């Protein structure tokens, strides 16, 4: 019985005490528990309780909190009850707490506290019990109240035989696998009982999977609710076509809204048996020979192609940039051969050139691969090579003369790669579904070995050979646009926009679009560009701002966050924007504001200083490849030296702005918290 964890000596009526905040309460609670000999180290216990609260609040029911302690400091399992007066617990509903159940558990034994949470949750979801328990002032009063409502409990579920189909099944899982996991379960079951619904809820907590759903449960349910705050195995739910994904908090606070989604068939069928965890799985899962949800698959296919392309960009771009660095002594008199005079520089330049020449074919091929799997690779590569200008058909862009069989000296670049990859996939689908579908069984074996690779690729290449003409002009227009935007007047605006995009979603589609634009500018202009410099410098700003804020004011971050915050120095200097993601997730408003403002400033300054770089990646380690083309600064050495100095100025100013916003927000938030505590 879960009430056996309660005891008279662990009921504390502290309604006359005042606490600065919940951490002040936890400190005093740890001291009181050590005096009662249920823990042996109040400091260790306090740190464990504090860490748990910093992960996610345990104030999950109106006016009640369930902090839990799982630590080596616990001598024996216990539940301590604290009666307090309107303590701000930063609860989910933002209401003050009046009653606290502090649960202590041995490190290697979790069943007792899970039993308490599960059973007590059922009582708290009874509105009458929830209102009365907040008024108890003694251990005896609490026990009598629990006994009274335990006697009145009825079965939560109707008999299995009464219905064969569940109204919904659900899985609940939170990061720690304790309170939210079970509260979400109880909230869903209480809602189901109230509305006479037949349900089954599986929990995936610290005690493993309980009440596990079978394949029959899932397949025969009207819908599936995945109330999960962490990744679980989704492959079991593919057969159900009405799957809803929500947080445990949503399931706890608004189970009615969640059920309405199930009831109105607003769910979806999960993509091919599992959520893909990497790009290879994405490509395999999306390799369908049909046009179902094709518009949605296009977006994911392009991102997949970009991810395959990026290693070629980084490798080739950095090697080419290093060749210029090694050949720096010949910069002023090498003319068009700069980067190839020195033998080592020439070797690196040629090797980097091979890698760089493959980025368009790789992009095209893997866009097709992501849509139709392996059959898209051959036509995708071929049209990608045509896009990069490695075939016949030349256009004199100034007068529009087309030389059909002349070696190509123009390219459609990334425009051709994207369109060509999509065209290849579409034609594969058409061939599979309409052209070769009625072949006799004896010929099906050679369809994928001979017919589609040979005739399909020939047709795709011939069609794209013609379609590529307007794409060449589109790419030419982009080159003209970049030349215009590199002017002293418009360059700051270009940098401003790229800086905003780079810092918006840190590795997401908008960030990738800005970065790819910088890479495109490198390829189109065959030289260092402002776009690439703006993308790299502004992408370094978010992690560097966080690191500087942590160095100036440690209290902006939790103790556990500080090592990661300091590590952002290295992440930022290496141009790894993703180092800032954990901090953005935890404090999205302040971090996103700081990132956008600081990144936009950095990008605008990059344009104003006419900074350019030849390398697509590397951060501070490729700063020697920076240069400025500001008027009056002549000579490669001087342009590089001044360029490095101005790049550091851009970073320092942006870091100061970003860290100031983070620190300022922290000061304001803590001032408001102190003011609120005084008023209460």
From Swiss-Prot:
Superkingdom to which the source organism belongs: Bacteria
Family matches, as InterPro entries: Bacterial_PTS_Sugar_Transport (IPR050864), PTrfase/Anion_transptr (IPR016152), PTS_EIIA_type-2_dom (IPR002178), PTS_EIIB-like_sf (IPR036095), PTS_EIIB_2 (IPR013011), PTS_EIIB_2/3 (IPR003501), PTS_EIIC (IPR003352), PTS_EIIC_2 (IPR013014)
A GO term from the CC aspect: plasma membrane
Domain PTS EIIA type-2 stretches: 4-149
Reactions performed catalytically: D-fructose(out) + N(pros)-phospho-L-histidyl-[protein] = D-fructose 1-phosphate(in) + L-histidyl-[protein]
Secretion signal, residue range per the UniProt entry: none
UniProt GO BP: phosphoenolpyruvate-dependent sugar phosphotransferase system
UniProt KW Iron-sulfur keyword: no
Catalytic machinery residues: 68, 174
One Pfam assignment: PTS_IIB
Protein location: Cell membrane
Membrane topology, record value: Multi-pass membrane protein
PTS EIIB type-2 domain residues: 168-264
Residues the record lists as Phosphohistidine modifications: 68
A GO molecular-function descriptor: protein-phosphocysteine-sugar phosphotransferase activity
Domain PTS EIIC type-2: 298-675
Domain comment quoted from the record: The PTS EIIA type-2 domain is phosphorylated by phospho-HPr on a histidyl residue. Then, it transfers the phosphoryl group to the PTS EIIB type-2 domain.
Role this protein plays: The phosphoenolpyruvate-dependent sugar phosphotransferase system (sugar PTS), a major carbohydrate active transport system, catalyzes the phosphorylation of incoming sugar substrates concomitantly with their translocation across the cell membrane. This system is involved in fructose transport.
Name of protein: PTS system fructose-specific EIIABC component
Organism of provenance: Mycoplasma genitalium (strain ATCC 33530 / DSM 19775 / NCTC 10195 / G37) (Mycoplasmoides genitalium)
GN (gene name): fruA
């Amino acid at each position: 019985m879960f009430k056996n964890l309660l005891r008279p000596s662990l009921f504390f009526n502290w309604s006359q005490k005042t606490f600065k905040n919940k951490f002040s309460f936890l400190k005093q609670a740890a001291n009181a528990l050590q005096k009662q000999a249920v823990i042996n180290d109040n400091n260790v216990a306090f740190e464990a309780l504090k860490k748990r609260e910093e992960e996610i609040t345990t104030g999950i029911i109106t006016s009640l909190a369930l902090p839990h302690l799982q630590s080596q400091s616990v001598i024996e399992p216990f539940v301590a009850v604290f009666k307090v007066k309107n303590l701000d617990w930063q609860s989910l509903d933002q209401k003050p707490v009046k009653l606290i159940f502090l649960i202590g558990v041995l490190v290697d034994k979790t069943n007792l506290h899970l039993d308490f949470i599960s059973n007590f949750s059922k009582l708290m979801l009874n509105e009458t019990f929830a209102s009365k328990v907040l008024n108890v002032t003694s251990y005896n009063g609490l026990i009598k109240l629990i006994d009274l409502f335990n006697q009145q409990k009825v079965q939560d579920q109707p008999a299995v035989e009464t219905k064969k189909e569940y109204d919904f099944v659900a899985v609940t899982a939170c990061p720690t696998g304790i309170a939210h996991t079970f509260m979400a379960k109880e909230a869903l079951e209480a809602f189901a009982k109230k509305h006479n619904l037949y349900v089954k809820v599986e929990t995936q907590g610290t005690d493993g999977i309980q009440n596990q759903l079978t394949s029959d449960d899932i397949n025969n349910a009207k819908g599936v609710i995945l109330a999960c705050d962490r990744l679980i195995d989704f492959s079991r739910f593919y057969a159900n076509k009405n799957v809803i994904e929500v947080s445990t908090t949503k399931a706890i606070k608004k189970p009615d809204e969640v059920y309405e989604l199930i009831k109105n068939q607003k769910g979806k069928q999960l993509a091919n048996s599992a959520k893909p965890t990497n790009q290879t799985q994405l490509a395999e899962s999306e390799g369908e020979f049909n046009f179902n949800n094709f518009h949605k698959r296009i977006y994911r296919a392009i991102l997949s192609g970009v991810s395959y392309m990026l290693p070629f960009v980084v490798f080739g771009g950095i090697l080419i940039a290093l060749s210029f660095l090694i050949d720096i002594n010949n910069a002023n008199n090498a003319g068009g051969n700069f980067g190839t005079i020195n033998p080592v520089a020439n070797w690196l330049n040629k090797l980097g050139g091979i890698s760089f020449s493959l980025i368009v074919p790789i992009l095209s091929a893997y866009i097709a691969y992501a849509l139709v799997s392996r059959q898209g690779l051959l036509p995708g590569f071929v049209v990608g090579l045509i896009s990069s200008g490695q075939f016949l058909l030349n256009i004199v862009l100034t007068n529009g003369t087309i030389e059909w069989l002349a070696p190509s000296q123009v390219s459609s670049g990334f425009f051709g790669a994207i369109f060509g990859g999509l065209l290849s996939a579409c034609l594969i689908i058409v061939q599979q579904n309409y052209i070769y579908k009625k072949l006799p069984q004896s010929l099906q074996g050679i369809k994928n070995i001979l017919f589609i690779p040979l005739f399909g690729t020939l047709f795709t290449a011939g069609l794209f050979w013609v379609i590529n003409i307007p794409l060449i002009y589109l790419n030419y227009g982009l080159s003209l646009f970049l030349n215009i935007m590199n002017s002293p007047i418009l360059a700051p605006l270009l940098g401003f926009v790229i800086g905003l995009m780079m810092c918006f979603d840190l590795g997401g589609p908008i960030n990738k679009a800005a970065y790819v634009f910088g890479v495109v500018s490198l390829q189109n202009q065959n030289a260092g560009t402002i776009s690439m410099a703006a993308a790299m410098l502004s992408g370094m700003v978010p992690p560097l701002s966080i690191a500087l804020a942590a160095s100036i004011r440690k209290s902006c971050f939790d103790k556990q966050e500080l090592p990661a915050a300091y590590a952002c120095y290295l992440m930022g200097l290496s141009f790894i924007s993703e180092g800032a993601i954990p901090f953005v997730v935890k404090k999205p408003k302040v971090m996103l504001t700081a990132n956008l403002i600081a990144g936009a400033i950095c990008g605008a300054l990059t344009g104003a200083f006419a900074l350019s770089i030849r390398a697509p990646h590397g951060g501070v380690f490729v700063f020697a490849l920076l240069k400025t083309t500001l008027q009056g600064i002549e000579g490669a050495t001087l342009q590089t030296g001044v360029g490095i100095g101005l790049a550091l100025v851009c970073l320092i100013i942006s870091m100061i702005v970003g860290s100031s916003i983070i620190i300022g927000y922290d000061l304001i938030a803590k001032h408001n918290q102190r003011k609120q505590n005084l008023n209460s």
